From Swiss-Prot:
Gene3D superfamilies associated with the record: 3.40.50.880
Protein name per UniProt: Uncharacterized protein SSP1625
Family: Belongs to the peptidase C56 family.
PROSITE patterns the record matches: PEPTIDASE_C56_PFPI
Length: 172
């Protein structure tokens, strides 16, 4: 059976941090589904990339996915602003059940909402590192960091390393 990766997303995502890993996953034979507020709604990235939501967060069931991808940009901040906390709850399923969880740039911010960063080693773009540290994570400045089921990366320049490691994690 083909492994399926959930991608949680809102407007103003960092375009390449969605398109590059999504393409790498699909080229490696994995299925991806974009999850957002409203099914069939079109989301627009910071640089104009458009993507359609496949499944609404209200209908998405984390147990139906083999991994989670959280691209960066301003999307994670919008997701964290969900009044019902649905994206944090969705993400927490993956972190607490040792399901592969991939986050790049600002994406690791959503991991703060899981209350599951204490003692974890992760990375992210420089301006989110203080938040990650305050949540109990050991934050390092490396292109890609793997801590059990969580794979994090810093910026678009790290995408080759990030993509390689998320594919490796899913093939394990």
């Amino acid at each position: 059976m083909t492994k399926k990766v959930a991608i949680i997303l809102a407007d103003e995502f960092e375009d390449i941090e969605l398109t590059s890993p999504k393409e790498a996953l699909e080229n490696a034979g994995f299925e991806t589904e974009v999850i957002g507020d409203t099914e069939k709604h079109e989301l627009v990235g910071k640089h104009g990339e458009k993507v359609t939501v496949d499944v609404s967060i209200a209908d998405a069931k984390p147990e139906n996915y083999d991994a989670l991808l959280i691209p960066g940009g301003f999307s994670p901040d919008h997701l964290r602003g969900d009044e019902e906390g649905r994206y944090g709850t969705f993400t927490k399923y993956f972190t607490q059940n040792d399901v592969p969880t991939f986050a790049i740039c600002h994406g690791p911010l959503l991991l703060v909402d899981t209350d599951d960063l204490k003692g974890r080693t992760i990375t992210g773009v420089i301006n989110v590192r203080k938040d990650l540290s305050n949540a109990g994570a050991h934050v390092v400045d490396e292109s890609v960091v793997i801590d059990n089921n969580i794979v994090t990366s810093r910026v678009p320049d790290d995408l080759d390393d990030f993509n390689r490691e998320i594919i490796k994690k899913l093939k394990a």
